[in-house]
């Protein structure tokens, strides 16, 4: 049985002091959480130092929102994997739609980051994929998403998939209040799992974690998580307040 991975993505919110305070509330709130649920928080780079002091030694994993595929050098504004590991980062989000849109990241760059991440001792790498509203309306959802999966995992060995989490995040549902119906999400998640089976094996497909991201909240999370191929959520706005994030966690772990 696959575990449920609930990751809060705090994006560009909170000072380091504010982030540490929210993280402390979450850590305290999940002290006795069901072992089948994995809780993750992803603050800004500038908050990692303070938040890691809160999450260290707890059952809450600490993540980063991006990283460079280079380990050092003339990469102004970027951050290296070793720098993240210094702050106890457990996982990194790669290929988020906002990075694709605002930072110009493409599949080739994202794949380089995946391959670099696998060379470092992160517990997990979250590879995000998803289609725009225009692509969905043209009936291209599966073509776009599965192509991103293939490109993102290029040259990744099956033995490394245990450290890869896939996150389907329809771009049109991120921060808009719109959410794919559980049936729409399940259709894509099932297709992704079948693609993993085609690329690797049935065992790999059965075991890989596939999160859903896109305006997840306490009202829709239970329905989404009830689908066969949805194994967790990458949560934005509803993870910014400890009480709303804890309500989501408690609803799934009850």
UniProtKB/Swiss-Prot annotation:
One of its GO terms (molecular function) is triose-phosphate isomerase activity. The keyword Glycoprotein does not apply. It is found in: Cytoplasm. Pathway: Carbohydrate biosynthesis; gluconeogenesis; Carbohydrate degradation; glycolysis; D-glyceraldehyde 3-phosphate from glycerone phosphate: step 1/1. Substrate binds at residues 9-11, 175, 215, 236-237. Involved in the gluconeogenesis. Catalyzes stereospecifically the conversion of dihydroxyacetone phosphate (DHAP) to D-glyceraldehyde-3-phosphate (G3P). This is Triosephosphate isomerase. GO terms for cellular component: cytosol. Homodimer. The gene is tpiA. It comes from the Bacteria. The active site is at 96 (electrophile), 169 (proton acceptor). InterPro entries: Aldolase_TIM, TIM_sf, TrioseP_Isoase_bac/euk, Triosephosphate_isomerase, Triosephosphate_isomerase_AS. PANTHER family: TRIOSEPHOSPHATE ISOMERASE (PTHR21139:SF42). It holds the Pfam family TIM. Keywords: Cytoplasm, Gluconeogenesis, Glycolysis, Isomerase. GO terms for biological process: gluconeogenesis; glyceraldehyde-3-phosphate biosynthetic process; glycerol catabolic process; glycolytic process. Transmembrane segments: none annotated. It catalyses: D-glyceraldehyde 3-phosphate = dihydroxyacetone phosphate. The keyword Disulfide bond does not apply.
